[in-house]
Every structure is written in C-alpha cells, then in structure tokens.
C-alpha cells in the first residue's frame, strides 16, 4: 500500500500506456500472465479461424498476452491487436526485421533476412545516408478504430546477445548497438511523436551463467532508454538455468524498478506430461515475473505452446486452473492506472 513511483522512457506516454506500464510492474505480485506467439493467426490443424486459439481450444480462454511479429505487418495482425485491446489483453511486438542493406526479391535464404548478419547498423547511424533514410521509413505507429494509439510493448532488437542477427553481438560493436537502440527510441518518441510504446529489451538466456545479471544487462542502452527487461529462454530441460536466470532478472527488476518477463520460451514439440506445472510454473512461483510467453504453434513439428492432443494438454489445463496463472479473463483493467502509482 506504499506509494510507488516509476519512470518511463517516454514521459509523454499516453495515460493508457502509463497505466499498462504500472500494471505490468505490479501484476507480478499477483501472478504471471501467460502469452503465446501468433496465437490468433493459426494453431495445430487450423489457420485463420475467427476468435480461435489453441489455448482457447483447451481452456475456453485466450492467453493474456498476444505476441506478434512486426515483420510483414498487415491489416489482419493490426486487427488482432485491436481485438486483444478491446478484450483487455496485452500485445507485445517482436521484430524479425529484414536486413535493409541486403533485402530484396529472389534472394537465397538467409540473405536479406534477420538472419543475414551483414554489417549495416553503422550505415543506419549516419544521418541522411541511404540506409538511415530507408530505416526511418520502416518505423511506424499503430492506432485503434478511433485513431487513439493502442499501448503496446515493443522489443525491436531482441536476442541481441546472439550472433544470428544483423543487430547482434558480431555484427555491431557495443557502441553501435547502444546508439542504434537510442536512435530507434529517439526517432519514434521525439520525431514521429509515438507515445504508446513500452520499450523492451530481451537478451537470450538459455544457460547457467557465471554472471547472469551481467548478461541481462549486456549492451544496456541506459536506464532512460529501456522500460521493460525481458529474456528469451530456450533452456531445454535445464531447470537450473531457468531458476538462476529468473532469480537474476527478479533482482534486476527490484534494483532498477522496472517490470520484467519471460518474452519467449518453450520446448519444440517435446513436452512431458507435467511440463507446464513442473518446468514452467514451479520456478515462476519462486521468482515471479509479469509474463511468460510461449513461442508459436506452426505445425506438429514446430510447436512450443499447448494444443489439444499434445502430451502436456491435460497438464496445461491444471496450469490454467492454478490461481497464480493469469489468462485474458483474469485480467482487471490493465489500461487503468492503479491507485498509489505515479509515472515520471
């Protein structure tokens, strides 16, 4: 019941965005929101069905968090964000953005994709250069049916600890990455006047590390440039890794006064019968965070979340029933500022 003061990257964020931010910080005291990537678009054995998700097929309820990719954004995805907002859910946007230097038609994968780590960030940072102007055109905002900005969590340069992407550990220097992150924030916030974004950084945390907090803060752009700290956790069955990294991210959250969450996780079509209650829920109860987001269910060989017929389906129903897990119907108004909280 003590007054709480939080700070955001954008002091001019809309009231709804500030309220979402405050609730993301506080909700970890209540439980953990479950999210699923691309859940309204497709699932196992279906594509494009209205108001459907694999999670809803199992539980009758949608995930609390809708994770989607800004890559090839279209009206369908934008409408899913609008519908999620109307129902009271939360949207988090990742961005597998093409390499602006090498992208183009008739390229052989991975040339031109996110996975093409050809160096380009140094060119983007040159004001007025071809790559600088091209990249500025890519950045855009999203609005609801009435033209009001919908609050979203945005993680544009995810897994920057890795070498697979063109903004990552081998394609940029530390100074270039930090400058690039700040360039994105400054352009959206100060030039475009976008005030509905919660800026999230999300290193990949798959192993037990000697200095997990140091890895979480790898190439940290500065407290004034990050709102939310996520981590992408593909640790397989290494429970020690998940526990130790959850402990570290909770410590960072307490120190920085910022919300945190597991922004990607899951086992690719390799769930045990007690996966959700043992491998996922048990550690989260010990080290609570705002959300845990399973990666997508594209097909039976590439499925990270639950679905009917999966070995973990019955266990997920128990996961759903647990008072600690939060799904869409469990959410109070995430876009109303809780009492006793101020944002600066």
Which sequence ranges carry the predicted segments?
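Boundary/entry segment of secreted carbohydrate-active catalytic domains
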Residues: 2-58, 62-72
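Substrate-binding cleft of secreted/luminal carbohydrate-active enzymes
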Residues: 15-23, 27-41, 45, 259-344
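Alpha-helical scaffolding within the catalytic cores
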Residues: 19, 46-55, 75-79, 134, ...
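Acidic (Asp/Glu)-rich catalytic clusters
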Residues: 25-27, 53-61, 79-90, 136-148, ...
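Structural recognition of the beta-strand scaffold that forms the well-ordered cores
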Residues: 32-36, 63-69, 90-95, 152-156, ...
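Aromatic-lined carbohydrate-recognition surfaces of secreted/lumenal glycan-active proteins
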Residues: 35-37, 155-156, 181-214, 258-271, ...
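Substrate-binding cleft of extracellular glycoside hydrolase catalytic domains
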Residues: 71-73, 77-194
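Aromatic- and acid-rich polysaccharide-binding/catalytic face
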Residues: 215-239, 295
């Amino acid at each position: 019941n003590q007054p709480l003061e939080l700070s955001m990257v954008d002091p001019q964020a809309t009231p709804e965005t500030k309220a979402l931010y405050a609730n993301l910080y506080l909700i970890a005291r209540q439980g953990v929101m479950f999210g699923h990537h691309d859940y309204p678009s497709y699932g196992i054995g279906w594509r494009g069905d209205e108001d459907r998700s694999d999670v809803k097929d199992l539980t009758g309820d949608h995930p609390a968090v809708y994770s989607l990719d800004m890559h090839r954004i279209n009206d369908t995805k934008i409408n899913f964000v609008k519908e999620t907002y109307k129902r009271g859910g939360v949207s988090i946007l990742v961005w597998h953005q093409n390499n602006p230097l090498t992208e183009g038609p008739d390229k052989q994968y991975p040339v031109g994709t996110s996975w093409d780590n050809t160096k380009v960030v140094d060119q983007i940072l040159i004001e007025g250069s071809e790559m600088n102007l091209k990249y500025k055109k890519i950045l855009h905002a999203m609005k609801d049916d009435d033209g009001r900005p919908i609050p979203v969590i945005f993680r544009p340069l995810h897994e920057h600890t890795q070498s697979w992407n063109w903004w990552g550990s081998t394609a940029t220097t530390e100074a270039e990455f930090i400058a690039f992150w700040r360039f994105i924030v400054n352009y959206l916030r100060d030039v475009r006047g976008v005030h509905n974004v919660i800026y999230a950084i999300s290193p990949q945390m798959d192993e037990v590390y000697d200095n997990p907090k140091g890895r979480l803060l790898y190439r940290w752009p500065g407290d004034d440039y990050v709102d939310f700290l996520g981590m992408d956790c593909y640790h397989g069955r290494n429970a020690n890794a998940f526990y130790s990294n959850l402990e570290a991210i909770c410590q960072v959250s307490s120190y920085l006064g910022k919300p945190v969450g597991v922004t990607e996780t899951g086992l690719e079509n390799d769930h045990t019968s007690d996966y959700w209650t043992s491998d996922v829920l048990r550690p989260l109860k010990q080290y609570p965070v705002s959300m845990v987001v399973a990666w997508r269910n594209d097909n039976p060989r590439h499925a990270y979340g639950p679905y009917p017929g999966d070995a973990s389906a019955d266990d997920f129903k128990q996961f759903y029933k647990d008072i600690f897990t939060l799904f869409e119907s469990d959410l109070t108004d995430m876009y109303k500022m809780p009492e006793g909280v101020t944002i600066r």
